[in-house]
Regions:
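P-loop NTPase motor domains
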Residues: 18-31, 159-160, 164, 168-447, ...
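Low-complexity, polar-biased intrinsically disordered regions enriched in Pro/Ser/Thr/Gly
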Residues: 134-138, 254-265, 503-520
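Short gly/ser/thr-rich secondary-structure transition/capping motifs
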Residues: 144-151, 358-360, 461-462
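Conserved ATP-driven motor cores of ASCE-family P-loop NTPases powering translocation/secretion/packaging/pilus
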Residues: 439-541
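Short alpha-helical interface patches
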Residues: 88, 95-135, 238-249, 293-297, ...
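Short alpha-helix boundary/capping motifs
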Residues: 12, 54-55, 89, 368, ...
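Basic- and hydrophobic-enriched, low-structure N-terminal and domain-boundary segments
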Residues: 1-171, 175-177, 510-511, 542, ...
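A broad, low-specificity signal for short, low-complexity segments enriched in glycine/proline
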Residues: 122-129, 145-155, 174-175, 336-339, ...
């Protein structure tokens, strides 16, 4: 109690001294303004005015000082002092608010020195001869992707780094990451989306680099001249190609994601039937229409089994395997065939069937596409019973396998320039079965893989727990945006980032007024879950190898030097889409 009274006494004394100073200063100010004699008393004489408010001239010994002028000066000084105190308080509050809202200087995160030594342009260029052996003096954009900036330094990822982008809907993944990656890619690009927003910005720019094609089986971007037809049975004379194609189709059914009892078994049965049917169709020169007809019922697939049984180029045992599924007991057969029908259900849509039924002069050459730095846009919705997701997955697997073959025949067994797989909304669209492998091994063969997901929870749902963990572990660069509502993911991120020492100072007063300082140390999270969730729009948390977490200011494509040209390009493409939409819009019937 005594210490508290002492503190109160000191505070009161300070207030009195401050008030005395103001009252004394007001006398000097009023005397100067009115021409009266200057006060001669010290600061403490100002308190005497409170006892004789009507005669400040006598108290302050300032002849000619009028009371009205004096108290006006007092009011002015008190008002000025109030403004200064208010502004100082607001400045402190604003500083605290900025410290809470702006995570750039969070203790334990990467400093400018850390960024310089781990993610700068200089570090990237040191590895350039390994990344692009064909270039003598490469520039940073030729061997890497700029993610943003931190502490005035560019934050770069190399072309051999797998980049995982995590952010909820409307968190700016396309604005900050996908569009820039497509525009900056030094080689060919394969990109997916459920909407044509990235396409409208980048289509014209990529046309100036190489050939452009749009695989749009559901006509989400109808009116573009770069429409592509791709044969679903292309190359399936080769059993390995048929197996890869079937894996892409079967995985997109979701049977193996963990939500279906014995899902892995049924997905395997589906894959076995599909690879046999694809192989048979390719050997006998059949089309996607025949493949769809076979998928309608096991009895219709007898035709495919007969082709495999009689064709000399058929893979050994594939005909018998398909026949075994067809002749299985009804319950097993129907369950297995449910996956086959689901994988090819999209072919029931005439538009989709047409997109995978190219004419003789419409064949797509993936090798030429990759060698000429082409850009392929894959558009499909991720909802509905006739989603084209399985076709997109199969198409990507086809291109990836072609890229691997080209890389194997290239110097250093590396595709040069590298292929970018910008897989936006791939979790909603078509979960690629090979994504964990691509993330782990693709960089070494010249494949830059950048899946863009809404959360790790989405990855666990679409790929399963083990595969989702493999995707996370294999990503060299992890870009985490704010706004996540998954408490588990946020807690995992915070735990991965680690902890730091926080010092707490305590002032202790002894019995005789002596003060001592005690300092305690405790471990706290560098970035608690709340801080990660509250990352502002346009700011990301970048985890790069063993570097401290980098708080990065992302760059929007609208801030690029060529933004004006890109905006013009987007307007032209959107005009094409709108014109096509008006032409295909049904005319309402007129009243008779």
């Amino acid at each position: 109690m005594g210490d508290e009274l002492t503190d109160l006494g000191l505070i009161g004394l300070g207030v009195l001294l401050g008030l005395a100073t103001v009252l004394r200063a007001a006398g000097s100010l009023a005397a100067w303004a009115t021409g009266a004699d200057a006060p001669t008393g010290n600061a403490l004489t100002g308190l005497g005015v409170l006892l004789r408010p009507a005669d400040p001239a006598c108290v302050l010994r300032a002849d000619g000082l009028h009371p009205a002028a004096y108290w006006t000066a007092v009011a002015l000084l008190l008002g000025l002092l109030g403004v200064v105190v208010w502004q100082a308080t607001q400045a402190v509050l604003a500083t605290n608010h900025r410290q809470i809202r702006s995570p750039h200087h969070t203790p334990g995160t990467a400093t400018r020195r850390d960024v310089t030594h781990t993610a700068s342009e200089r570090v990237l260029l040191k590895r350039s001869r390994t990344l692009r052996p064909s270039l003598r003096k490469p520039t940073a954009p030729e061997v890497g992707y700029q993610l943003g900036a931190a502490h005035g330094q560019g934050v770069w990822a190399s072309v051999e780094d797998s980049i995982l982008v995590l952010g909820p809907p409307r968190s700016g993944k396309g604005l900050h990451m996908v569009v820039n990656a497509i525009l900056d890619a030094p080689g060919a690009v394969v990109t997916t989306s459920t909407r044509p927003d990235a396409l409208t910005v980048t289509l014209k720019a990529r046309e100036r680099v190489g050939p452009v094609a749009v695989f749009d089986p559901q006509h989400l971007a109808k009116g573009l001249p770069a429409g592509l037809r791709w044969s679903i049975v292309r190359g399936c004379e080769d059993p390995l190609t048929a197996m890869i194609r079937a894996t892409g189709l079967a995985s997109a059914t979701g049977l193996g994601g963990g939500s279906t009892e014995n899902g892995g078994f049924w997905e395997g049965m589906t894959r076995s039937a599909l690879q046999a049917m694809l192989h048979a169709a390719a050997l006998d020169g059949r089309s996607a229409r025949d493949l769809f007809a076979w998928s309608n019922s096991p009895s219709a697939a007898e035709d495919a089994a007969a082709i495999l049984a009689s064709h000399p180029g058929a893979a050994t045992g594939w005909g018998q395997s398909l026949e075994a599924i067809i002749q299985a007991d009804p319950r097993t057969r129907d369950s297995a065939w449910m996956g086959v029908k689901q994988a090819l259900a999209c072919l029931a849509d005439p538009r989709v069937l047409d997109s995978v039924s190219p004419g003789p002069d419409e064949s797509f050459d993936p090798e030429a596409f990759l060698r000429n730095n082409g850009t392929l846009y894959l558009l499909a919705t991720g909802a509905g019973s006739v989603t084209s997701g399985p076709l997109v997955a199969a198409f990507i697997e086809d291109l990836v396998e072609t890229a691997r073959h080209l890389a194997a025949a290239s110097p250093g067994a590396r595709l040069d320039p590298p292929l970018l797989l910008a897989l936006d909304e791939i979790g909603n669209l078509a979960p690629l079965p090979s994504l964990p492998t691509l993330m782990a091994e693709g960089g070494g063969t010249g494949l830059t893989t950048m899946p863009v997901l809404q959360s790790l929870s989405q990855a666990r749902d679409k790929w399963g727990e083990n595969a989702a963990n493999a995707i996370w572990d294999a990503s060299i660069v992890k870009v985490i945006l704010g706004g996540s509502s998954s408490s588990k993911d946020l807690a995992d991120f915070s735990s991965l980032i680690g902890e730091r020492d926080e010092f707490t100072d305590t002032h202790i007063r002894g019995e005789r007024g002596a003060r001592t300082l005690q300092r305690a140390v405790r471990r706290v999270a560098i970035m608690p879950a709340q801080a990660i969730r509250m990352l502002p729009f346009g700011i990301s948390l970048v985890l790069l190898r063993a570097a401290p977490p980098i708080i990065t200011d992302l760059r929007t494509w609208t801030a690029r030097p060529d933004a004006d040209q890109l905006t013009t390009d987007r307007t032209q493409v959107e005009t094409l889409l709108q014109t096509a939409a008006r032409r295909t819009r049904p005319t309402p019937p007129t009243a008779s």
